[in-house]
Amino acid sequence: AARRAAEVEKVAADINAKGGRAIAVPTDVTNSQALEALAQAAVDDFGKLTILVNNAGGSRAMGPLTELSAKDWQDCVDLNITAVWAATIAAVKRMTEGGAIVNISSLVARGPIPGSGHYGAAKAAVNSLTETFARELAPNIRVNAIMPGYIPTEVMMAALGVADESGLPALAKQLAIPMGTFGKPQDIGAAVVYLCSPASGWVTGQMLPVTGGH
């Protein structure tokens, strides 16, 4: 699920072509009705819902908190906090056989982020939601979060002012990532698989950093 239909349709087609099974559901996570429809689509097509990954997030607004507009603040809250809460509520109502929820937080939740304080505060709130949902939904539903480090996604590159991939090597050196490279989406995907699998059956309420040691 994502806002851009063409992108999710391509991902679903790739999964189906490789022998998996997927459906594409264009979804704006800031719309609670769309989240309800998404959760129900999973049940209708697959027969049940057992896993939710809250992966939508970000903020293109940058600047000191004292200069942030009320709209930019609210947009960040709607996308990064309210959507996580609303999607979890929509999924939990349908997780009749138990399940696992993974929230994608961020390393910025750990401390002050001048110029992006609203986003850091939102991700800190995601961690708090993760811990509380984990307590409230145990033992049938496990809830954990992943805190990614620097991964050159479209949103991160825009936030750091990198125009294209040619600027990444210099930025990686500047950031001094211990593992020596930026992360990849697959690094986060592997952590999600762990947190949704029986291998993490006694893990809940945890924030897992996947940061290359940063």
Residue ranges of predicted features:
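The beta1-alpha1 cofactor-binding region of Rossmann-like NAD(H)/NADP(H)-dependent oxidoreductases
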Residues: 5, 26-38, 70, 186-187
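Residue(s) in the substrate-gating loop at a strand-loop-helix junction
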Residues: 106
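Short, flexible catalytic-loop segment of classical short-chain dehydrogenase/reductase
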Residues: 110, 147-158
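Alpha-helical segment proximal to the catalytic Tyr-Lys
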Residues: 93, 134-139, 201
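Substrate-binding pocket helix/loop in short-chain dehydrogenase/reductase
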Residues: 63-65, 72-74, 173
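C-terminal helical subdomain
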Residues: 145, 168-203, 210-212
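Active-site helix of classical SDR
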Residues: 88, 122, 130
